[in-house]
């Protein structure tokens, strides 16, 4: 009609509508049941453990220990354990956040088949999730590199405190939460750990290693097989809090595509798998997952 003027769309309204539609897609995906979940560091930021590649990710400030460094250099191992000894206390104090608990509720209700996590903090199991595959291991376990005996991190911590009296107290008063990395260590200067003494295996005195997959290492075949089995029997794959930058996680998106399984992604920021997803939602998991659980389980109760 003559005389009418067109107005550009309200960007805030468009963004709100897009988020509402993405959440509706998330709700529909999970409501159908049979969902395998893949989680990354973004699920644990609400518990005070930073991620690697998010807006404030630790990779911007910290280069993680690689498998090659840890295995080839005794001094690198000592440095790792000194930094990890300080960081472990922060990780050990971390508790599941509402996002972890919401996933446990959805699994208990029969909507989720299980969780494959790239995290090493053990928070999914602590929240009550039953079928959890710790793809990259668990910081709460340590292994002897010589005899293969597995031990607990709690026992190692007691032995390290006895061998290094007062060491951890030097850093106890500082703002460690901002400095702890997702792999459980803390960025410390070499001069701060020069006198740190590492202990060996209590059985054979061999070198110890954490039961985690370092950067540059491969996921143990049996663990990978368990994760693939979970995905292969699922109706859908839901990726939560992972940028999918490393192949250990992205491979499951590729596998889902091969199987014709729909993929949904919830993450703060873009991911490597966005173009393969039926929806993406940029959201904080500790907020969106409790809402999802409340809507689905509340609807089931009615």
Located regions from the model:
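Conserved catalytic core of sirtuin-type NAD+-dependent deacylases
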Residues: 2, 6-302
């Amino acid at each position: 009609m003559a005389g009418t003027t067109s107005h550009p769309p309200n960007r805030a309204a468009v963004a709100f509508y897009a988020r509402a539609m993405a959440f509706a897609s998330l709700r529909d995906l999970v409501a159908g049941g049979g969902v395998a979940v893949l989680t990354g560091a973004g699920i644990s930021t609400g518990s005070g453990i930073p991620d690697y590649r998010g807006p404030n990710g630790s990779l911007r400030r910290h280069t993680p220990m690689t498998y090659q460094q840890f295995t080839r250099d005794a001094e690198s191992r000592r440095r790792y354990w000194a930094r990890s000894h300080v960081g472990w206390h922060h990780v050990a104090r971390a508790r599941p956040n509402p996002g972890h608990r919401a996933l446990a509720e959805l699994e208990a209700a029969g909507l989720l088949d299980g969780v494959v996590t790239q995290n090493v903090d053990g928070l999914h199991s602590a929240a009550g999730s039953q079928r959890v595959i710790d793809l990259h291991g668990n910081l709460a376990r340590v292994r002897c590199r010589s005899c293969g005996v597995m031990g607990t991190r709690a026992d190692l911590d007691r032995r390290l405190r006895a061998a290094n009296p007062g060491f951890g107290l030097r850093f106890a008063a500082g703002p460690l939460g901002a400095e702890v990395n997702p792999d459980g260590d803390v960025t410390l200067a070499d001069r701060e750990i020069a006198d740190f003494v590492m202990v060996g295996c209590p059985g054979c005195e061999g070198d110890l290693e954490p039961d985690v997959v370092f950067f540059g290492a491969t996921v143990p075949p049996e663990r990978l097989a368990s994760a693939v089995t979970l995905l292969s029997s699922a109706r859908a794959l839901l990726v939560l809090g992972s940028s999918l930058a490393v192949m250990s996680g992205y491979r499951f998106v590729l596998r889902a595509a091969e199987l014709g399984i729909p993929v949904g992604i919830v993450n703060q920021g873009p991911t490597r798998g966005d173009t393969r997803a039926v929806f993406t939602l940029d959201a904080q998991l500790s907020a969106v997952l409790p809402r999802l659980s409340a809507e689905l389980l509340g609807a089931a109760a009615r």
